[in-house]
Amino acid sequence: MSNLLRTPLFDLIVQQKAKLTEFSGWEMPVQFSKLKDEHQAVRTDVGMFDISHMGKFALQGTELLKSLQFLVPSDLERLQPGQAQYTVLLNPQGGIIDDIIVYYQGITETGEQRANIIVNAGTTEKDKTWLLSHLDTQKITFKDLSGEKVLIAVQGPQSVAKLQAFVQEDLSQVGFFGHFEGTVLTKPAFIARTGYTGEDGFEVMVDPEVGQDLWRSLFQAGVTPCGLGARDTLRLEAAMCLYSQDIDDNTTPLEAGLNWLVHLDSKGDFIGRDILEKQKAQGVERRLVGLQMEGRHIARHGYPVLYEGKIVGEVTSGTLPPTVGKAIALAYVPRSLGKVGTPLEVEIRGQNCQAIVVKKPFYRSPNRF
């Protein structure tokens, strides 16, 4: 795997004897100990993830939010400084180019708006090209921080208590999806109360040397290092979409059940709006639903979904997660079959296995901020 990219935390991760895997061109830890232990650490205590492979953009310019408005279905202009919005970049067909988080940082002394945007690792260059082709670079400066910064996710009900020891500012005062420019280990940092686990937590962006020191400090403080395996089971229990599996260029946010980030009534035109308006008026033909399997059969990505013996859809993600304790999956099925309680089948290695449509998310944390 010598041709793969590595994050600045790679050597530390190897020292901690992580099992490695390829992910979107990066050599990343899939697990450090047992996946179940890492998963449960995040659900009951606190864990940390190296997510430095994700794309990181810093934008600044006049009417920045107004410019970004045209690229997403969410109303970004309602954001106050220190607030963030999970949203999607859309193509003209209403398909999802990527799911992203826009962190609005406010206005500079010269009247320019500032924002950080975090994107998926596998779509960083694609997103960068799309953004630069649609933004006025005479008015907006675009800086790609992807190779310059470390990004560490500290997740779990004890994340405030564990991370606070290394942060100067009071983390308890930061709201969910809030963020600020603060101080970690006496050095500048960007800190956000966001995550991809369904638990309370923070994502911290710092310079590489600071990131290495923070990783060591958190580890010494008893924070469990976690790999991509636990990250996947955690996000799936929380029914969070994974780009290129659950959503892609050919799925719209309404099909994916992301209706809550489509703000048709409070904003003007945006790329793909006509498609979403039509889908909202007529209803989508297919929906991303949650499935619970009977027994311990695990439905995997690409497995056919059947109804009365006929293939009607496809599984996008599936696992047997530690907290839920039952095999679960996400799948696209016709709208008429998306009602909770609908019996379906999934073909697993030539065998039709029973499944039922259930409400999402599969797990809702009692500790969620």
UniProtKB/Swiss-Prot annotation:
GO terms for biological process: glycine decarboxylation via glycine cleavage system. GO terms for cellular component: cytosol; glycine cleavage complex. The keyword Transferase applies. It catalyses: N(6)-[(R)-S(8)-aminomethyldihydrolipoyl]-L-lysyl-[protein] + (6S)-5,6,7,8-tetrahydrofolate = N(6)-[(R)-dihydrolipoyl]-L-lysyl-[protein] + (6R)-5,10-methylene-5,6,7,8-tetrahydrofolate + NH4(+). The keyword Transmembrane does not apply. One of its GO terms (molecular function) is transaminase activity. It is an enzyme of class 2 (transferase). Its EC number is 2.1.2.10. InterPro entries: GCS_T (IPR006223), GCS_T_bac (IPR022903), GCST_C (IPR013977), GCV_T_N (IPR006222), GcvT/YgfZ/DmdA (IPR028896), GcvT/YgfZ_C (IPR029043), TrmE/GcvT_dom1 (IPR027266). It holds the Pfam family GCV_T. Keywords: Aminotransferase, Transferase. The glycine cleavage system is composed of four proteins: P, T, L and H. Belongs to the GcvT family. The glycine cleavage system catalyzes the degradation of glycine. This is Aminomethyltransferase. It comes from Rippkaea orientalis (strain PCC 8801 / RF-1).
